Amino acid sequence: EDCLNILGRKGILVHDMHLNRWKTAPLFQRVCSVSYNSFRFWIRLGQWYDGHGFVKEALQCLKLSGKEKEIYSCMIRNYQKVPFSGISFDEVMKWKESIPEVCYLRGMYCYFHQNFEGLNREIIRLNKMDSDEKKKKEIILNLTYVKPDMSLEKWLNLLESYAQKAGTFSLYSMLGNSVTYLCGLRDLSELFACTRKEENRKAHLWRECLGENEYTGYCLARLDYYLEIQQKDAVRDEDWDVIREGTDQDFWQLRLARMYLLCKFQTMKPDEEIAEYIRYLRETLVYEENEWCVRNVDAVDNLFFDRTNKRERFSVWLLHSEDDLRQDLNEDNYLLFFCLAKGFILINQYEKAERIHRKLIPYLQCYRRSYLLAEILFQQAIIYWEGRESSQMLRSMIESFMISGEYRYVRMYIDYGNRGRGVLEAYIEWLRSSRPEGWHRKKKYNYGNVLRMPLEDYMETVLRLAKRETKYVLPLQDHSVEEKLTIMETVILQDLAVGASNAEICKELNLKLPTVKSHIYSLYKKLNVKNRIQAVLKGKELGILK
């Protein structure tokens, strides 16, 4: 143990607090890798990993052995975990067997590749099986849970009918690679956008028919929804308890979902104790071996929490993430694309945000993730408005509120400062002129929450809250010799470092020339320099530029 601690202090090993084990630091992993040719070695190593619960590592070793029988056996034993293990499982599409486990793996493979006809075939195949065992029903529930064209109400009815005979069931994953249970593998807004009586009925059904982990996910989804519709006072104590009672031994997806919700609450009501807990959760997550855990932690940390405290880091995160935009969109990275789109909107880089939207909008429509889609459509409206394309802006706003009109989202519309407020004002003014009958009646303001309001009152409420929100200002956090740069100044400094002219900066950031010159003058003053070369050298000295 002393040797391990010494190697940890030297940076050769890293301690994984969640799994309570040591692993090689990323810097040394390539150096430590050795090539082995014996398939027996890889089988034995894979079996060891499998026996200790490390499914991804087990399959990596067994694939290196080249023995399909061993790969098949491992996947069947761990069929619930394989689709979410972060490793390819395309072998399943070649298998001819029709046992429930194989049907599940094939169905999830089809789901991830948007082959919904293939997903339906596996569900039909399962329903035709003579076996009435609980495993088959549980697999059907998991496959229909991710089926985009199956309503949540219909799925709940299926769950209830199965549970009457077979007891409680498990969902193998609710989150996928999302950070919010409200919009993971399935959008759950429908559970809460209803009367309190109906919500309680669904909550009771969820609790009675599913396990403890699933109810924890339900509570976090409900908390997220009530924060989104600005009803934090209506949040139930048991939902807060799910966050307060968490430990660093919980699986990483749950810890990340907690971190996201705390960051969201922090933007509404800053609290140093919550900020400290967010930092603690981050420390437990950054050493996870799952790449997308670390990437999503970084995105949440920069976009929802640290952008107010570490502006340079926020802009550097955006800059360094641009390479990801060349990748194909999939279940692993769609949330990162969503976060990057929002980040680019916040610093006026509309062209980059729009490139993301071209991929992300059809993807979210395909999987019917209403919660994320409504916000992306609002972002698209902001881009059109800034480009003076009024008709396109109106179309995007209509599409966004067609979703929000049902679920009554609020916060997503008030987080964009003056940009968002201008779009809301223009859209509501257009509605007043085109549909006067709904806007000129006498309003009442004691509905209790947005779910009870007529559509016109709901939209007026969103606009009123957007006006109340001040333009996003990034406060100084310390009093170093050099004043902190704003996000825009940091981005411009990065452009100066690659030799961009003022005209090129104007085009990239969608700014006018006097505005760019003003930012450059301001960053010169803050860095105490007189020209571009000195500014770049100072930026490197301070660590702003890499």
What kind of feature is each model-predicted range?
Residues E97-M259, C263, E273:
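Internal alpha-solenoid helical repeat scaffolds
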Residues L4-Q47:
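Short capping/hinge segments at domain boundaries that bridge a core fold to an adjacent linker or tail
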Residues K56-L59, E68, Y72, S131-L143, ...:
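Alpha-solenoid helical repeat architecture
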Residues N37-H113, G118, E122:
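Extended alpha-helical scaffolding segments used for macromolecular assembly and cargo binding
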Residues F337-L373, L377, E386, L394-I487, ...:
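Linker/hinge segments immediately adjacent to helix-turn-helix/homeobox DNA-binding domains
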Residues W48, C61, C74, Y109, ...:
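Residue-level signature for tetratricopeptide repeat
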